[in-house]
Amino acid sequence: MARPVVAIIGRPNVGKSTLVNRLCHSREAIVHDEPGVTRDRTYQDGYWGDRDFKVVDTGGLVFDDDSEFLPEIREQAALALEEASVALVIVDGQQGVTASDEAIAEFLRGQRCPALLAVNKCESPEQGLAMAAEFWSLGLGEPYPISAIHGAGTAELLDQVLTYLPPKSEEGDSEEPIQLAIIGRPNVGKSSLLNAICGEQRAIVSPIRGTTRDTIDTSLVRENRPWRLVDTAGIRRRRSVNYGPEFFGINRSFKAIERSDVCVLVIDALDGVTEQDQRLAGRIEEDGRACVVVVNKWDAVEKDSHTMTAMEKELRAKLYFLDWAPMLFTSALTGQRVDSIFALAALAVEQHRRRVSTSVVNEVLKEALSWRSPPTTRGGRQGRLYYGTQVASRPPSFTLFVNDPKLFGDTYRRYVERQIREGLGFDGTPLKLFWRGKQQRDAERDLARQQNRQG
């Protein structure tokens, strides 16, 4: 059984995201003075005592307004309550009971999820009890005065949360999930792709750019293994983003790339590869992440039997630094090839984590040298490649011992990398090659030691 879920519910700007960050000991949830910063439901890992659980943060609930994303936010909150063991209902003790609080209480009475009432912004313990007493009128049980920003009262609240969680014995042991980040420019279909993958409305979809502000974590099982999918905020040029919630979401997106095992770079089939797509691809390669390139909106392209081949050639010419990444043409709208993403991503992760023995590496290098010798300078000095060994994975990294790294130009270095890929695979992952100068006698001695260790 998966870890139990605790849902955070409340109207806008009562401090839900601040409480999430407090419960999860992080700053993942975006906190900003502007109401409605959180729109989709986002997941983080929380713990208290000897229990681990998931905390799901939902958008601010408003029932007397159907403009913009408010109906979708209500739908996201209802979905969060369906999977939660308990809901924490957050209200603002300084403002007192509002009509919005009463509407939320009425909404919760129609749900099957039990609720605990937390009265936030009770910074003074003495005044907090008096402020909390007013909220008995909501009919949601005992109100617990807390200060999300300072942590006061949260221990007692969490003790009550644990009483609603299923027995720990039902959770079982679980394999660590693969972290998959869905990244791309605004409005290329990232959230639609996430919803198509999950088979439910996990993220709000809109033609308005910047709909997704947070990174949205989704846990599921595919290819017989657990995955954690992260739908990131659309990443634009920095100069086109004002300092505010969207800025923080983009910063969170770059962090999602850093903590991912594999990235799905979503390209709009109608737009082709833009300069911003190239920058994102460069970021993936720079961070050493496995990658699958997904060309979305394929259903909207007029095509014949040659279109896919021609378009792939055109796209790869502009994404030349991701020439090792598999490319998949999909439609989030129709679901075409969406399920194939996991098979390609799983293979990329496997290659990203792969290790190869020194003897096998040197067989490939020997073959490469037989086909093409290292370059010779005008002064008659020739590069010598003594041996190579894999020194790390995630991404696979190799140190190549040579007489002088300066004798190996970019052209020959690219040739060696291509030969390693042709001989050993590593589809879907970048490689890092380190060229290190060494005297021949020392290199031969070190090679013998390496081979003896691997026996």
Curated annotation (Swiss-Prot):
UniProt cross-references to CDD domains, sorted A to Z: EngA1, EngA2
Ligand binding (GTP 2): 184-191, 231-235, 296-299
The protein's name: GTPase Der
Family: Belongs to the TRAFAC class TrmE-Era-EngA-EngB-Septin-like GTPase superfamily. EngA (Der) GTPase family.
Keywords: GTP-binding, Nucleotide-binding, Repeat, Ribosome biogenesis
Binding site for GTP 1: 10-17, 57-61, 120-123
Keyword Signal: no
BP terms from Gene Ontology: ribosome biogenesis
Quaternary structure, from the entry: Associates with the 50S ribosomal subunit.
Role summary: GTPase that plays an essential role in the late steps of ribosome biogenesis.
